[in-house]
Amino acid sequence: MKMSNMLVGTLREVPAEAEIESHKLMLRAGLMRKMAAGIYNYMPLGLKVIENVKNIVREEMNNAGAQEFLASALIPAELWQESGRWDAYGAEMFRLKDRHNRDFCLGPTHEEVFTDIVRNEIKSYKQLPLNLYQIQTKYRDERRPRFGVMRSREFIMKDGYSFDKDQEGLDLAYEKMRKAYVNIFNRCGLDAKAVAADSGAIGGSGSAEFMVKSEVGEDDVVFCTACDYAANIEKAPSTPEHGEKEELMEVEKVETPAVKSIEDLAKFFECSPKKIAKTLIFQADDKVVAVVLRGDREANEVKIANAIGEVIELEMASEEAVKEATGAAVGFAGPMGIKVDMLLVDQEVANMYNFIIGANETDMHLKNVNYGRDFEGIVGDFRNVTIGEKCPECGKEITISRGTEVGHIFKLGTKYSESMGATFIDEDGKAKPFIMGCYGIGVTRTVASIIEQHNDENGIIWPLEVAPYHVSVIPANVKNEEQATKAEEIYNELRKMGVEALLDDRKERAGVKFKDSELMGIPMRITVGKMIGEGQVEFKLRNGGEVETLSIEEVYNRVREEFERANLSL
């Protein structure tokens, strides 16, 4: 491609809307342009990167025995109603009606569609196992789109589904997909780690996320400092601290005027927050749920939702709902006598002695409260783990880092096949539901994550296999006929070799061309300058190193070396 013919628009200034490096650089390098909040148009340069990532995904999925097809993005409501998710998915789903007033949605995910196809096409165990995937545009009406394509309302995703006759088959399919995902992210140049995860709205049992460490990641990821254990904080089990055993004391009501926060309570009672139990009140669809935690702990809404059961939306209760449940102003809720549909008590609170709670009376608290004697509820793990707690596998300390999810694999089991009546005839002639797995990769999010891990102050540094172009050929002075002619000859020879080459034949200063090449992240640069009269050119790698002066034949070999180093063939 010649840059004089290319739709490219690099930007020197950072767009005000961009908060993170990938968003800034995707706009500055001309990979995409914003059309609306969370909606982007991909320019030629960006589309080439996306297609390169797609091709890596295709190769690894095909090598693992999966078959590609393409489902419709427009899905009739009936399929989602069969699975029970039409109402359960919530406000993120884009819903619409056709001219006959029939309900449809723009697919945020495709479990129902794949299940419908397979139940109509596969009748016997002899046709199993089966693994299908597609690379499709998805739509989710995010409450707050941000960070460019990291959280957008329209995005490209690879979603795949396996269908097996038994659990052993699913386990095998799951492991094949796990290995394929490791290969995909390695080839994309991403340092991604599989971590234990919650299944969320997808449902099912076993689940792992592929996480990329990132300071701007939206997830907290728990890592063990000694072993390979890793989990999303939503999934990671907490280790309860056991309070020192004390003699149970009589409950005492204490006036605490305008003392609401844990910090203020600790000062008022001259105690540690560990001696206080806070009561948080949630609205879970039509249920009001109270959760009791130690004062210094954070609630884990995923664990809470899982304990409640089928929950469409979990949010903090309104001030009115709190007053109705407690009979008091906000800040004085407690588990004794509270009027809620469900009372969840973190396991740590059940092991505390003589602690302080809200009295369900404005400006009043109770002290010397003990679980079991004074109140009871459903005991479980309802909080986030914290740095320094014990690893559930080896007992050593854990640490917590921010991360971005780029892939997710699930063992769905029969969740969708049973609800949608998707069955096959087994060896004994009996109808059985398909055992399913689900495997997703965010293609556009992967592109952004690559940029997050591969950039410097000058721009993007693409790994060779995903780069839009492998080599940028730059005549230092296009007005110099010899430089322009030789640059085009080198460009044409590289293309014959199978190299994706970009010839910057624009009538711009060499410095401008160098800056654009670095901003766009082209892995190799060949500069045809004054030394061309001696048969020499300059070669430079984008990811560092000195400028090398080489003959034209040597520069071709140098390009080949970089392909070999990246395990790529020409």
From Swiss-Prot:
GO function term, MF aspect, one: catalytic activity, acting on a protein
Swiss-Prot/TrEMBL catalytic activity: tRNA(Pro) + L-proline + ATP = L-prolyl-tRNA(Pro) + AMP + diphosphate
Pfam families on file: HGTP_anticodon, tRNA-synt_2b, tRNA_edit
Predominant cellular place of this UniProt entry's protein: cytoplasm
Similarity field: Belongs to the class-II aminoacyl-tRNA synthetase family. ProS type 1 subfamily.
GO-annotated biological processes: prolyl-tRNA aminoacylation
EC number: 6.1.1.15
Annotated Gene Ontology cellular component terms: cytosol
UniProt subunit comment: Homodimer.
Keywords: Aminoacyl-tRNA synthetase, ATP-binding, Cytoplasm, Ligase, Nucleotide-binding, Protein biosynthesis
Organism annotation: Clostridium perfringens (strain 13 / Type A)
Subcellular location: Cytoplasm
Domain remarks in the Swiss-Prot or TrEMBL record: Consists of three domains: the N-terminal catalytic domain, the editing domain and the C-terminal anticodon-binding domain.
Gene3D superfamilies per UniProt: Anticodon-binding domain, Bira Bifunctional Protein, Domain 2
InterPro entries on file: aa-tRNA-synt_IIb, aa-tRNA-synth_II, aa-tRNA-synth_II/BPL/LPL, Anticodon-bd, Anticodon-bd_dom_sf, Pro-tRNA-ligase_IIa, Pro-tRNA-synth_IIa_bac-type, Pro-tRNA-Synthase_IIa_type1
PROSITE patterns assigned to the protein according to its UniProt record, in alphabetical order: AA_TRNA_LIGASE_II
Protein name: Proline--tRNA ligase
Function: Catalyzes the attachment of proline to tRNA(Pro) in a two-step reaction: proline is first activated by ATP to form Pro-AMP and then transferred to the acceptor end of tRNA(Pro). As ProRS can inadvertently accommodate and process non-cognate amino acids such as alanine and cysteine, to avoid such errors it has two additional distinct editing activities against alanine. One activity is designated as 'pretransfer' editing and involves the tRNA(Pro)-independent hydrolysis of activated Ala-AMP.
